[in-house]
């Protein structure tokens, strides 16, 4: 990959406040807007521009953050509306400048479709945006803009569009085997842990685990989503790859008990995640 220069401006001098991001050679502009600072951008010229935006926050999902993806011809007015009628979000990431209404409609459709396919976040959009047809040249501009969206969201720590590695492409496989459970997975660069399809998990949960909150809720959720399906009287099977926030969240779900994922997951040589990654 080639070197990329990214400029970040703090217009209020506050690292926790509004940020404006630009990339060398790119005509677009990104605004990072904490919800409590929304009205501080009212007087900026760009607040009247067309934009695609992402609202991030915590929802009911114990694993994944929630996101709403939208577009608007005048983005500030739309965010004001969301400030009144959407409770979950705490930060808005807005991409504007260098795009028109047709571009942002195209980008909204592409963003929602890809986010749902990757499935790292709880997508709040109720309606699938219609695809907006562009000319060949407009599409090229929009696709270039979308690459910058993916880059900047990644730089900001939002993995919405980060590809999930396939098992055959992973060089470091870790295994966790316990009573009635045998799972394989790998640690991602984000600190998340993916458990691969075909792994098994123990059905029976320990008494102390049941009395907890996050572990049982997580297991109940992935069972309800049919990610974990009953294989026999003792075991579930993962019917697809699943990303957990941490190695321990993954091992807890596999074992039906509290565990330390950094020592539970071992490579083919028997070394733990802790030995390979933290020492």
Each predicted region: which residue ranges?
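Hydrophobic/aromatic-lined pockets within catalytic cores
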Residues: 84, 112, 116-120, 154-157, ...
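Positively charged interface segments
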Residues: 238-279
